[in-house]
Structures are given as structure tokens and as C-alpha cells.
Amino acid sequence: MKFIFEKYYRHPINKYNGSKITPISQKNIFVVIKVELDDNELNNIHDEAKKLAEDVCEKNPSGDIRTEERKLLSSFCGLIAEKVVKQLITEKLMLIKDYIEIKGANVSNENFNYESHNDIEIHLSNDEIITIEIRSSIATKYDLNDILNKDFDILGSYTTSYKSKEHNKDYYFRIIFHNPGDYGYNPHLKKWEYNKRLENAFKQEKNKALDYFKNNVKVYFVGGCTFDDLENYGEHDDLKQKNAEYWIIRPITKGRDVLEILEILEKDILNKLGFL
């Protein structure tokens, strides 16, 4: 797994009226991490995802039935997101690795279209636990700058008609699977049609599915927020999903970039361990 830092200018705007939004941080540069996975990693994740997909909830929050390929794709993306975050946290906290244990909880695909949600727990040597929820989305927008500054959110906790309450986590991290292809240049191609191409690729045998993924999708860890950020700066939205309500920070650049959220997490852990 290889991590490549990329920087964008932070200028969050309201996607509905174009007005400027005040970010939590005043830092002008917004740093994200592009993740490159090798063939062996992708093969192993696909195998693991096939097993997990068997237990995925049949319905999304809107009550729509998921296809088998959608469940596989969502599990696949969710596993990538979890492994990316666990590896980054491990590298960030290498100096105190003997004081912590990072555990992946479970892959949950109860979120909406092309969304998956994973939980990570960091168990400290003094028996305290820090919880992280990872939300991942597939984005077809051609310009990643628009994804960050306008079109996508940091997703917090949510409720649905069949999941009335979700326990709040300490942190919420955001992963984007950028799948633009020719979508930005093809006026006749609807978003759902382009998303369907990726979903249909996962109907095929593993090698063909992974070839399509490698040639069309880039993986980004784009930052996140704390629970306090959600309380102080978040808003509620159904995100066009009936019977669901999400707590969000909109857009992504209103929240914390990768460097900020990992720094806050590290200080939180050191403080809880009594080193600060």
C-alpha cells in the first residue's frame, strides 16, 4: 500500500446557491492522500469481500433491494477503506505502538447507494477505547476539487426507519473512490448509468473486475471530523434517501483534512495515555 499526498485549496461553497461557507479550520491548503494498492492486496481484499457480502443487509436505508454485485462492490470498497485507515493510523502512531491495539469491527452496508461504513476501535493500554467510523463513497464527478469543496460531505451518524439509533463515535473519517472515466465529458451519460458500469464489473470473474477497478477508480482518504465538530458545526439531511437522516458536515473542506484529523487523533491518544 502506497500513500501519496496531494494538496488542494480550501474554499468550501454551498452547492445549491454558490455562497461561501466558513470552514472549521482556517488553513488554506487542504491535504488528501491518494492510495495505491498492489495486485496482491486487491486480490486478497476481493476474496475477503466475497465472504462478507454473503451477510450484507438485503436492503439499503431507503428500503431498496441490493443486487449481489452491489453487495460485493460495497464490501470490497468498505474493506479497502478500513485497511487504509488502519495502516495510516499504525504508521502515524508507530512510536507508541506498544500502548495501542487497532481493531476493525465489522463492515456494514446499511448506508445509501455506493456507500459503506466500517468501524475501527483503538484500544489503549489503560483500557480506554477510541472509536472511529469510516464512511466511503464512489464519486463520478470529474473534478476532485468540486468533490471536496462543494459536492460531497463528511458523514456522521444516521437513523433509518429500521435502524432508529446509532451510537455516536469519537471520529468520522471519509474515503472517496473517484470513478470519473468519461462521465465529465459525456453529456448523454447519466450518473446512475456510469455507476452501473462499475457495479456490473463486479458481476464478472475476479481478474476482470479488478482490472476494471484499477483502470477506472482512484482511492482517496480525504479527512474527517470529530464528534465535537459534528455537534458544533454539523447539520442534518436526508441526502435524498427516504426514511433516513444523516448528521453531516458539508462540504468536505469545511471539516478537517488528513493531516489535521490524524494530528487531533494522535494528541487525543497521547492525552488519554497521560503523556500530555
UniProtKB/Swiss-Prot annotation:
<protein>
    <recommendedName>
        <fullName>Uncharacterized protein MJECS01</fullName>
    </recommendedName>
</protein>
<keyword id="KW-0614">Plasmid</keyword>
